[in-house]
Swiss-Prot record:
Source species, domain of life: Bacteria
One annotated GO biological process: translation
One GO MF term: structural constituent of ribosome
Biological classification of the source: Bacteria, Pseudomonadati, Aquificota, Aquificia, Aquificales
NCBIfam families the UniProt entry points to: rpmD_bact
Record's keyword terms, sorted: Ribonucleoprotein, Ribosomal protein
Family: Belongs to the universal ribosomal protein uL30 family.
Assembly with partners or alone: Part of the 50S ribosomal subunit.
Gene field: rpmD
Identification of the protein by name: Large ribosomal subunit protein uL30
One Gene Ontology cellular component annotation held by this UniProt entry: cytosolic large ribosomal subunit
InterPro entries: Ribo_uL30_ferredoxin-like_sf, Ribosomal_uL30_bac-type, Ribosomal_uL30_ferredoxin-like
Amino acid sequence: MKLKIVLRRGLAGKDKAKKEAVRSLGLKKVGETVILEKNPMVCGNLEKVKHLVCVEELS
């Protein structure tokens, strides 16, 4: 299964762990979209930054 992830909020003022989690997902700018395979690494990083991103499951 794949996930469509969109960065909805900026990283200004966020701690280092949240910035690294967003970068590891391949996101840099607000509004940027990536499509990734669902796996434990991706799910763990999404849990850390769920308030900054929008996630949609693709079939």
